Amino acid sequence: MKRKQKRFLQMTLLFTVALIFLPNVGLWSLYKDKHLVKSAEPGEQQTFPLGLGDGQFYSWTDGLRRKDWHDYESIQKEAMRSGKGEHGKPYPLTEEDHDDSAYRENGFNIFVSNNIALERSLPDIRHANCKHKMYLERLPNTSIIIPFHNEGWTSLLRTIHSIINRTPGSLIAEIILVDDFSEREHLKDKLEEYMARFSKVRIVRTKKREGLIRTRLLGASMARGEVLTFLDSHCEVNVNWLPPLLNQIALNHKTIVCPMIDVIDHNHFGYEAQAGDAMRGAFDWEMYYKRIPIPPELQRADPSDPFESPVMAGGLFAVDRKWFWELGGYDPGLEIWGGEQYEISFKVWMCGGEMFDVPCSRVGHIYRKYVPYKVPSGTSLARNLKRVAETWMDEFAEYIYQRRPEYRHLSTGDISAQKELRKQLKCKDFKWFMAAVAWDVPKYYPPVEPPPAAWGEIRNVAANLCVDSKHGATGTELRLDICVKDGSERTWSHEQLFTFGWREDIRPGEPLHTRKFCFDAISHNSPVTLYDCHGMKGNQLWGYRKDRTLFHPVSNSCMDCNPAEKKIFMARCDPLSETQQWIFEHINMTVLEKFNHHANS
């Protein structure tokens, strides 16, 4: 009997140990990934654990093998670089370097571009978790397609060098440069000779000016890679940028993926993240591209994980080649540029695919100061946008026409082939897109604009003059001027109609037709200027009180003026001062009271 009890106790002990130990075997790789791979502290020599970055593979619970794709030798080599512009630091500029001639041909400071290294180093500004991520061992290769027209020599070369230096060679099937009928000599034989050193680079040239959309289509039609990756010709890809993109496509080939697009300053070439960094792509109902916060419902436990985005910014993305052509590529009826990012975004979501932004993939992009070349005559961004709206947006196109009535009578050209494609692909309607994908967009950009609190001219009581923004842009200081309705001359030069809208900001223009600039003030005593509207309140939040003062909560001050000098500025609130009293031409008291109740609650 005792022997049986002893044997029973032994078996029970073994079973208990098994219960404790065996489940944790499966957890080992998770523990190892989380705790055994450590990033260096600032100033500490980076060391890399055995098995990471040396081709060793790791099996996941889904049975797929993954590896670390980082090139640590290259990373350490870049860390040792020094010089002007290295590590993405701004180039030190003198007064002469700001001369407009440096911008004239390219829309960015070509002098700076010519004076920083073609293989300059960049800061690794990824989320820390990106440094430990593994991606599939077997990733598809890609054709990288780069259209260009009259691009600067060094900006184009820097794009290519960054790709070659920061991309695993096995993942590059080819790099296709598509020359859209450039005229500059350095982009002809000189470019051919330079690119001959790169075995995977080939140059394709158009026979006439085709525009960005058709040059991308031309490059895609000649591509051999399993994936198409589109980049602009003035970019710099960052560390380990490609594997995170290809990984998403390998997991689901009906996926379009976009990198985080960082900003390379057009003046000093400093490299930094966009304001807000990881945000969802969106649009307003005039079809301007916007970025909105990721809602809590879509935020991942790991902020470095890919997240869904309704629309892409446009120029930088990757897509499975076969899936791209199943979707019909770009609509070939779109001219030059504009609207294509909406067309491909709506199409992929409505026709059975999905789109993600990938925080662990980062690419710097020069946002030009202005477009340096002429768009061929007869082309129209408005026509492109209407063509997309009529093909994909169904009854929601009406919201665009309400804000852009001039679009109603534009010709879209023949869209029957696009309508038939949508039918063949069994695509969902735009109402589904707004409900299932872009459900958070109306919170920031409602299709039906809520009524404003006040609009029309803003007249100062003391001066009997009106606020005038003179059709200015960001940085323009507001001034007082003779009110147009009082018989001011040269009315075309004035801009005296403003809207105090539902966002509680003040914009030039009438309701439904406001411009994208807002009254902005930094602090007490600062001038009141126009600044790009950001919709995040802050410096652009205003209140219109019963004493007719325009109150600025952030600075705890009121809008004031100097009638003699016609200046407008912020000052300590004094409700008895007539220079701080402003009269809106039209007021909706119901909305205004709601604003004030919200401000006081």
Curated annotation (Swiss-Prot):
Documented EC number(s) = 2.4.1.41
Primary site of residence:
Golgi
Q: Which residues are glycosylated?
A: 141, 588
Q: How does this chain sit within the bilayer?
A: Single-pass type II membrane protein
Question: Where does the chain bind Mn(2+)?
Answer: 232, 234, 365
Annotated GO biological process:
protein O-linked glycosylation; protein O-linked glycosylation via threonine
* Alphabetical list of SUPFAM superfamilies matching this protein: Nucleotide-diphospho-sugar transferases, Ricin B-like lectins
Where would you find the membrane-spanning parts of this chain? 8-28
Q: What are the disulfide bonds?
A: 130-360, 351-427, 466-483, 518-533, 558-573
Matching Pfam families: Glycos_transf_2, Ricin_B_lectin
Positions that bind substrate: 180, 209, 233, 337, 368, 373
Q: Which Gene3D superfamilies match?
A: 2.80.10.50, Spore Coat Polysaccharide Biosynthesis Protein SpsA, Chain A
Write out the annotated subcellular location: Golgi apparatus membrane
Q: Which reaction does it catalyse?
A: L-seryl-[protein] + UDP-N-acetyl-alpha-D-galactosamine = a 3-O-[N-acetyl-alpha-D-galactosaminyl]-L-seryl-[protein] + UDP + H(+); L-threonyl-[protein] + UDP-N-acetyl-alpha-D-galactosamine = a 3-O-[N-acetyl-alpha-D-galactosaminyl]-L-threonyl-[protein] + UDP + H(+)
* Sequence ranges on the Cytoplasmic membrane side: 1-7
Needs which cofactor?
Mn(2+)
Pull the Lumenal topological domain ranges from the record.
29-601
Domain Ricin B-type lectin, residue spans: 453-585
Cellular component GO terms held in the UniProt record: Golgi apparatus; Golgi membrane
Q: Which family does it belong to?
A: Belongs to the glycosyltransferase 2 family. GalNAc-T subfamily.
What is the protein's known function?
A: Catalyzes the initial reaction in O-linked oligosaccharide biosynthesis, the transfer of an N-acetyl-D-galactosamine residue to a serine or threonine residue on the protein receptor.
Q: What does UniProt say about this protein's domains?
A: There are two conserved domains in the glycosyltransferase region: the N-terminal domain (domain A, also called GT1 motif), which is probably involved in manganese coordination and substrate binding and the C-terminal domain (domain B, also called Gal/GalNAc-T motif), which is probably involved in catalytic reaction and UDP-Gal binding.
User: What is the protein's name according to its record?
Assistant: Polypeptide N-acetylgalactosaminyltransferase-like 6
List the taxonomic lineage.
Eukaryota, Metazoa, Chordata, Craniata, Vertebrata
Q: Which gene is the coding source of this polypeptide chain?
A: GALNTL6
